[in-house]
């Protein structure tokens, strides 16, 4: 009892509790708590709303160290936002879970959750209980997800005909910084995924796709390399710049003479001793180099470094080498070349060598930067997307954009059903939910109508960001959908003169759209069930 507060009695002997540090705690209850939550969620959603769609604007995020990030990716914007409010933090988590699960649609899910809470606020003002609103939203989400199944189309996932996959990837990349060359980027992403995809298991191992970037050149110079790029060069400038039919020894053991395992000290008292030590080291290095060459290897890739003496001997013996290659790259090289990683020098045999058709060094512009490209590998299922760009920010944003595109293509390989974008799916779902709401005899029908109105916020935001009159555009498209019974009619964001998203090839994955609706609804349900907040005051913190 003492930890909570003290028990006291009034003049009539009735007990009451004096809560400890009550003056230093802040507390919100009931409707006031709900309104506080809704306001915080709306603030986050409104920030994200202008980033939605192909004409969405980018955000510049500056962190505490002064590093600048310019991005259009919802998950990145929210993860870099400095938010204090506990509900705003939940919105950040919501976007992250969409990113982890689907990879795309991170902005849309936050905008939808914000719209649902905004509608819930109006229902609360009308005196409807939050649990009834939450139940109505749950029913409406179920109807919307069932309706998405009905209006979905199947896309042919075929290695010989990648065009449908390219169109879907183009939709994802349309709102990104790379949209000036989004056809090329979409093709690169599709080719990368199809190269590493396991079509029998309908799965893609992203570990086999490496995305590298180098400042310089233009975005259009980005290319897909069927092999591995390592941000290293040959250890000696006089080594050959290209090795053909490379047999690669992949070493994770130190390339140096063996040392005693115990703590030891070496006393060198004369010049002869020093020369003897030098001779021993040289002989050991030559022995190691001979051992590598005996296996038939003509290239050594080491995780650790080696000194200049060893480097010079490697050059003299005509064995090109690369040093200080990181662990993940070593693994990728081993997968690509079909080689085995050698942790002990004594275990090196010819069976453990990797094979690559060509290993070459590439240099960039006038800088001294060099990279190694390992191509024509034994296992062609490891690929690298090599991005070029004018500055570091563009390259980082291009990496994020390509990540979204790769995720979307992977989702299509797993489940090849799609719905049409441009707000078409949301308008169609809103109409379906409204029709069901009319048949609902209970109080939940108000929440279901509110859910339908919230779904329409997505197409309205798209038209607003494209410089159109949102209400007029929205009502015209909705009326046409009802009249023509065509769920592919959406907002013509790119001003192509047609509202038919099937004709414009604006395609989104069904799995991503379903996830958006269910995640946003779960989040809103959780927020509506909170009616009391207690947190420490400033002095207690």
Swiss-Prot record:
InterPro entries: Chap_CCT_epsi (IPR012718), Chaperone_TCP-1 (IPR017998), Chaperonin_TCP-1_CS (IPR002194), Cpn60/GroEL/TCP-1 (IPR002423), GroEL-like_apical_dom_sf (IPR027409), GROEL-like_equatorial_sf (IPR027413), TCP-1-like_intermed_sf (IPR027410), TCP-1_chaperonin (IPR053374). GO terms for molecular function: ATP binding; ATP hydrolysis activity; ATP-dependent protein folding chaperone; beta-tubulin binding; G-protein beta-subunit binding; mRNA 3'-UTR binding; mRNA 5'-UTR binding; protein folding chaperone. Mg(2+) binds at residue 104. One of its GO terms (cellular component) is centrosome. The modification Phosphoserine is found at residues 26, 346, 539. The modification N-acetylalanine is found at residue 2. It is found in: Cytoplasm; Cytoplasm, Cytoskeleton, Microtubule organizing center, Centrosome. CDD domains: TCP1_epsilon. ADP binds at residues 53, 105-107, 175, 422, 492, 508, 513. GO terms for biological process: binding of sperm to zona pellucida; chaperone mediated protein folding independent of cofactor; chaperone-mediated protein folding; positive regulation of telomere maintenance via telomerase; protein folding; protein stabilization; response to virus. It is an enzyme of class 3 (hydrolase). There is a cross-link at residues 20, 210, 214, 265, 275, 279, 392 (Glycyl lysine isopeptide (Lys-Gly) (interchain with G-Cter in SUMO2)). PANTHER family: CHAPERONIN. Belongs to the TCP-1 chaperonin family. NCBIfam families: chap_CCT_epsi (TIGR02343), thermosome_alpha (NF041082), thermosome_beta (NF041083). This is T-complex protein 1 subunit epsilon. It comes from Rattus norvegicus (Rat). The lineage of its organism: Eukaryota, Metazoa, Chordata, Craniata, Vertebrata.
